[in-house]
Amino acid sequence: MNLTGKKVILHDMSLRDGMHARQHQITLKEMVDVATGLDAAGVPLIEVTHGDGLGGASLNYGFPAHTDEEYLSAVIPKMKQAKVSALLLPGIGTVDHLRMAHQLGVNTIRVATHCTEADVSGQHIALSRDLGLDTVGFLMMAHMVSPEKLLEQAKLMESYGANCIYCTDSAGYMLPGDVTSHIERLRGELKSDTQIGFHGHHNMGMSIANSLAAIEAGAERIDGSVAGLGAGAGNTPLEVFVAVLERMQVHHGVNLYDIMDVAEDLVTPMMDQPIRIDRDALTLGYAGVYSSFLLFAQRAEKKYGVPARDILLELGRRGTVGGQEDMIDDTAMNMARELA
């Protein structure tokens, strides 16, 4: 693999996907400290919202320590070079949330849907473009569909106005060959000025290899998370990925030592538990289950006495997707009854 001279835009997820690992309880001070550290390190894009995006505060997904508006209002004025993005899932976030984010100075809106449901994103993508925002179509759980199906859905998002399309490995299930086939198909068939992105999780230990495969196949934006803070076993650990890109002579614009320090001095001390590939996180990747289900399954284990990995395997067998968090408790309860 020769990536010498390629250029990539790195996008940090620690303050959005990392919310899952912190049960959405990141404080305003932690949010500002990490964001300003990333900004100083040269990270160009930083995502800030509830783990499930704008409007995610709910009984189903979890109530955060502060509102999206409070987080964005605290972070955006402190940025010197970095731009702030916000995730929005239609059906959770609304056009009013989108307008609020725009008014507060958000630069990028990432409209996320399940990989077969791009048709629900049209209103939000169109409004985002009308507001002049960098607009991303974010196709989640991409491992569940063929490259051809992902392309079909990507073309819908592109037709609504998205200027960037993401192949999102929400479960950390994909292997480098899978990433290559999906990204190559997108790059070969979408408009030449539509950027391609990749979002990985580390549940099978493949996030860096997958991200490199994505760059080789034509991706220009890569998500990561400083210290890997994210759902499941976390996202692509950004400081490690920066070191790899340095070795491979890929242009990324981030200071390696500075981002190492953010990971070590700011993010690692924030963790409620180590972000690692334990048996439950590994099961997420192996079974192809949405990464944010991890803590829900572990809580269900304590409640019903069914091992979390068995719950996750059953959820994978049933083909559950993001947004079906309510099924975790039901599944565990039914499994406990069968074992009684």
From Swiss-Prot:
Mind listing the GO molecular function terms for this protein? 2-isopropylmalate synthase activity; 4-hydroxy-2-oxovalerate aldolase activity; manganese ion binding
Has UniProt tagged this entry with the keyword Cell membrane? no
| Reactions listed under catalytic activity | (S)-4-hydroxy-2-oxopentanoate = acetaldehyde + pyruvate
Residue positions annotated to bind substrate are 16-17, 170, 199, 290
Q: Which residues form the Pyruvate carboxyltransferase domain?
A: 8-260
Residues holding Mn(2+):
17, 199, 201
Report the EC number(s), separated by commas if there are several.
Answer: 4.1.3.39
In which family does this protein belong, per the annotation? Belongs to the 4-hydroxy-2-oxovalerate aldolase family.
Q: What is this protein called?
A: 4-hydroxy-2-oxovalerate aldolase
What lineage does UniProt assign to this protein's organism? Bacteria, Pseudomonadati, Pseudomonadota, Gammaproteobacteria, Alteromonadales
